[in-house]
Structure formats: structure tokens, C-alpha cells
Amino acid sequence: VTIDPVSGFRVALRPEGAGRLLLFDAGGAPAGAIEAPPGYRLSHLVETPGRLLVVGQGEAPVDGWHDWHFAIDVRSATLTRAGPAY
């Protein structure tokens, strides 16, 4: 379990299947989940000073890369492709 520095929520990666992120509020209560983007399998969380990222391993390359960092927006329960993971 890792704390998102933006929201203060706790984020856990459940690796079964394509993977999903489980979200918990600051008190530890379940607050939702985020599924892997289509065509990706969630691999691991990456902590940076300003935000929490998750690496998605793609089935096919996008702009020459299979693996991408996705920014996690806990409040809207979305992932946004942020840059290649290498």
C-alpha cells in the first residue's frame, strides 16, 4: 500500500488479471478502484515527489514503447499516460 501525495489516499495494486488499483481514503475505508487501461497490464507503483505513478505493460507498442508510466488521479479514478517506462 502506497500513499498518493496529491490526495492522501492509499493505493494498493491488485495484480490478478490485467491488474487494478484499489483506493482507500485517509481513514482506510474503501474508496473505489481503477482498472488497467485496455491493452495494458498494471505492473508496479512508482513513487515520485509530486505524484504516484503506475507502470502499465502494453500488449502492443505505442510510439515505440510497450511499457508506460500512468499518472493516477484518485479523485476521478482515472489513469493518464504520462511517459515511457524504461
Annotate each language-model stretch with its function.
Residues 4, 24, 72-73:
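Hydrophobic alpha-helical segments, especially N-terminal targeting/anchoring helices
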Residues 22-23, 27-38, 80-83:
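Aromatic (tryptophan-biased) beta-strands that constitute blades/sheets of beta-rich domains
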Residues 1-16, 50-63:
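Short beta-strand elements that form the blades of beta-propeller/WD-repeat-like
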Residues 1-6, 36-48, 84-86:
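Repeated scaffold domains used in trafficking and secretory/extracellular systems
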Residues 58-86:
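Short, compact, well-ordered microdomains
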Residues 19-21, 67:
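Repetitive beta-architecture junctions, highlighting loop-to-beta-strand starts
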